[in-house]
Design a protein with these regions (language model features):
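Short coil/turn segments at beta-strand junctions that form active-site/ligand-binding loops
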Residues: 33, 75-78, 101-102
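Hydrophobic targeting segments
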Residues: 1-5, 26, 34-37
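Short, acidic, metal-binding catalytic loop of nucleotide-sugar glycosyltransferases
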Residues: 16-33
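Active-site-proximal specificity loops/subdomain of glycosyltransferases
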Residues: 8-9, 13, 37-79, 90
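Amphipathic coiled-coil/heptad-repeat helices and related helical stalk/stem segments
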Residues: 19-22, 62-66, 156
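N-proximal low-complexity "stem/linker" segments adjacent to membrane-targeting elements
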Residues: 1-20
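Active-site acidic Asp-centered loop
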Residues: 81-83
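Conserved catalytic core of nucleotide-sugar-dependent glycosyltransferases
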Residues: 71, 86-158
């Protein structure tokens, strides 16, 4: 299974810590074989793993860019496009037992937070209009209507 995320350095150091914590947890997940990280600057990430594949770009990728990358580079594989602040657990194994052909799952998250930057709490995120990860098997159809980036208000529901 392939995880595809966008990574960038936020001006908020606590937020950067959250992104790195989530990345570290996902790299430790045995169900995730590869993590494809779309980034604008290769020097932004300060640790390495054989699972990490950096895709350096001059600009932020749109959803269409991410889905087309999966179609072209990860043919006939399960892909998980997710926000950088998402951690996956062993429930990903559920998708390995499904016929994922022409299926597309949009999932919301559980919220993680910290008050001191060291101790993290995890709780359900209560917002029915939120999706933070998209799981599918390539190929999937794409269109120009997907030309918007992650992290923009309302992007989850387009």
């Amino acid at each position: 299974m392939n995880l595809i995320i966008e990574y960038f350095n936020s001006r908020n150091h606590m937020r950067n810590g959250e992104y790195l914590y989530c990345l570290h947890q996902n790299l430790a997940n045995d169900l995730i074989d590869n993590v494809y990280i779309f980034m604008e600057d290769d020097a932004e990430l300060n640790f390495d793993s054989p699972k990490i594949h950096r895709i350096v770009r001059e600009n932020r990728p749109s959803y269409k860019d991410l889905f087309e990358y999966c179609n072209e580079e990860l043919q006939d594989q399960i892909c998980v496009v997710a926000n950088a602040d998402i951690i996956f657990d062993d429930t990903l194994r559920f998708f390995n037992s499904l016929d994922m052909t022409k299926q597309f799952y949009a999932l919301s998250r559980w919220e993680i937070s910290t008050k001191d930057g060291k101790n993290w709490e995890i709780e359900p995120y209560d917002n029915s209009a939120s999706q933070d990860s998209w799981i599918f098997k390539t190929p999937i159809a794409t269109s120009d209507s997907m030309n918007y980036t992650m992290g923009k208000p309302g992007c989850d529901n387009k």
